[in-house]
Amino acid sequence: MMNIPNIENCDLHGKAVLLRVDFNIPIKNGKVHDATRVLRSLPTIRHLVNAGAKVIIISHFGRPRAKDNNLSLKNVVKTLSQLLNKEVKFVDDCIGKKVQKVVNAIAIRDVILLENLRFYKEEEQNDANFAKQLASLADVYVNDAFSCSHRAHASISRITEFLPSYAGFCLQDELRYLEKAVSFEAKPITAIVGGAKISTKIKMLIRLAEKVDYLVLGGAIANNFLLFNKVNIGKSFFQNGVDSLLHDVVKIADKNNCKIVIPEDVLIAVNSDYSTCILRKTESVLDNDVILDIGPQTLSTISSIVASSKALLWNGPIGVFEHSAFANGTIEVMKVVSDSTHKGKLTSVIGGGDSLSAINAAGLTDKDFTYVSTGGGAFLSWLSGDKMPGIAALQSMLN
């Protein structure tokens, strides 16, 4: 696994530990709707508590332009306290004398949560002075926010210049499973890539085409490949000006014996009228058709590939699963992946912005797969081989 400093063998007794997590979670009317990211942070928090540390938790939430009560992390405190089975005190700021006073007063094994980091514009500016003020609160820094580690923000990368810095358990798990999935020795390895904008995923597609045996494409990304193959896609969504990029993906896939799998049949709506749902062969798509899901023949092909695979990576939905008439492809493939995982035949790693929603739509949970990543953009960045400032900053601790 990637060599980064971790907290397991650190003497943290009596030390103030600044723990960066990602509590940017769905909240409606002040109530947490999906606590997955909070749950993922618990092993690290419990380890710090048991080690006798003073735990100071920091996170961002949403994209505030200024202080906004609707984007306050106070909305997370109750859920965190309940899941941790321990009182968590909330502080309505993240830097300054008031925060320092609270930190000075906390005892070992206490846990406090500071206010939204993004209430200060300096967080996203990777401002050194802001990072230094955060660092002044603690003796040690721990990054447990893989899902933010692709960003060069003050609490992710700059802060490591001022404190001894380590990786938490969630971040380590993310890296371990992602590395395992793309370097799996047993074959075949399959990647499923869906979603809308192909330009944001080209680097990932090229990297995957070098490593996997099957590259299964869905969503608007598949539309682009159909169009590239001179297949009419009607009024379906696609991205212009990417043919040269698609050519690169195809060329690299051919060189590495990677089979690109695109739909053979599709479910369409006419003129984006979602109340119509018609099955067509891809070569029979009409000018007013909008492709919104895969058809049964494509589903059968993908299911057979998954059933024969030893490892699988999945990023992005296969169809417009938010609409029940066009959710079948995503849901049924999810179920096949889950079934193969439960039988011990498949190592499955799933990630990306819509992953948890798609898993929920299939009536499944993250326990039905080997690993479900908390990262959206970070998952994409890692698979694309991009430098991740948060990870690079931790690696620099070893130099």
From Swiss-Prot:
Subunit (UniProt): Monomer.
Pathway recorded for this protein: Carbohydrate degradation; glycolysis; pyruvate from D-glyceraldehyde 3-phosphate: step 2/5
InterPro entries xref list: Phosphoglycerate_kinase, Phosphoglycerate_kinase_N, Phosphoglycerate_kinase_sf
GO annotation, cellular component aspect: cytosol
GO molecular function, one term: ATP binding
GO biological process: gluconeogenesis; glycolytic process
Recorded catalytic activity of this chain's protein: (2R)-3-phosphoglycerate + ATP = (2R)-3-phospho-glyceroyl phosphate + ADP
Name of the coding gene: pgk
EC number(s) recorded for this UniProt protein: 2.7.2.3
Compartment(s) of residence: Cytoplasm
Family: Belongs to the phosphoglycerate kinase family.
Protein's name in the database: Phosphoglycerate kinase
Residues that bind substrate: 22-24, 37, 60-63, 118, 151
